[in-house]
Amino acid sequence: TSGKVSIKWFEDGVLNVTESCLDRHLATRGDQVAIIWEGDDPNADSKVTYRELHARVCQLANAMRGMGVQKGDRVCIYLPMIEEAAVAMLACARIGAVHSIVFGGFSPDSLSSRIQDSDCVLLITADEGRRGGRKVPLKVNADEALKTCPSIRHVIVAKNTGGNVAMQEGRDHWWADACDNQPKTSTPEPMGAEDPLFILYTSGSTGKPKGVLHTTGGYLVWASFTHQNVFDYRDGEIYWCTADVGWVTGHTYIVYGPLANGATTLMFEGVPNYPTVSRFWEVIDKHQVNIFYTAPTAIRALMRDGEAPVKKTSRKSLRILGSVGEPINPEAWLWYY
């Protein structure tokens, strides 16, 4: 089309997405599990209820407000696939700050360019990540990136591995120190439907990464509607999207969509082939996953090891299989299905 295309949703509407994803569930499903976290190590897992998640989000929101973060400010999140990633996203939304997540596997240069481009005032990271049995030096990478990011005033660091990392006086704060003594309630910032919710950068495969801005009202409706209807989600089911929160699929189908619908969402820190190539199917059995959403690349990689690693698991709980990220070839789909 020629000329400007402008699409606006519910333009005079006001909401805060965390009220839709958290507060409205407290009366009826406060003690239901919101997030099942499955660690890189198969022996590590935890569960967070809606009530617990709400409290943790409010505590971080209060800490961020105390650091001067205001509605419209940009906050960079550079975290592994741990509960804190979801808490950080929702805490930003709670106070009207715009989150910009950078995938934990990206380099200091990639992190720096994204922080500079969106002029972030706060970085939320961790000491280290874990991936396939190896440590990922997130704080070291962040410190390197921040040498060229004068806009960052504060850094909140989650203690994940307990690795020894440098902390800069006045700038860096341990997550627990910043949050643990904060009140467990926090007033949600009223947001216009067209107010920004997050920025996420394109992969950069076709030139410089571009920051794509997603607004509040239309995005949440789409996330909730598609999670409910595309996956035929039924109350009480366990939903697992294997994406990283660093990608838009992770934003939508690990955090915002499932939580808006009061679902139990699974968050996986690891990789499909660690410690064995049966890992996906073992996790499905362990947590009785009903809906499974993964990528053709992962399926094709697992196909190379044949059916034996799959068949040693039950997978009886599965009802729906989804594929995302690229077109799936018939051979991969038939093997998967």
Swiss-Prot record:
GO cellular component: cytosol
Gene Ontology terms describing biological process: acetyl-CoA biosynthetic process
Alphabetical list of Gene3D superfamilies matching this protein: N-terminal domain of ligase-like
Binding site for CoA: R131, G132, G133, R134, T249, N273
Binding site for ATP: G325, E326, P327
Cofactor dependence: Mg(2+)
Claim: Magnesium is one of the keywords in the record: yes
Signal peptide: none
Gene from which this protein is expressed: acsA
Stored InterPro entries: AMP-binding, AMP-binding_CS, AMP-dep_synth/lig_dom, ANL_N_sf
Role description: Catalyzes the conversion of acetate into acetyl-CoA (AcCoA), an essential intermediate at the junction of anabolic and catabolic pathways. AcsA undergoes a two-step reaction. In the first half reaction, AcsA combines acetate with ATP to form acetyl-adenylate (AcAMP) intermediate. In the second half reaction, it can then transfer the acetyl group from AcAMP to the sulfhydryl group of CoA, forming the product AcCoA.
Magnesium found in the keyword field: yes
Keywords assigned by UniProt, alphabetized: Acetylation, ATP-binding, Ligase, Magnesium, Metal-binding, Nucleotide-binding
Its EC number(s): 6.2.1.1
Membership in a protein family: Belongs to the ATP-dependent AMP-binding enzyme family.
Classification via PROSITE patterns: AMP_BINDING (PS00455)
Official protein name in the record: Acetyl-coenzyme A synthetase
Reported modifications of this chain: Acetylated. Deacetylation by the SIR2-homolog deacetylase activates the enzyme.
Top EC class of this enzyme: ligase
A molecular function GO annotation: ATP binding
Catalytic activity line of the entry: acetate + ATP + CoA = acetyl-CoA + AMP + diphosphate
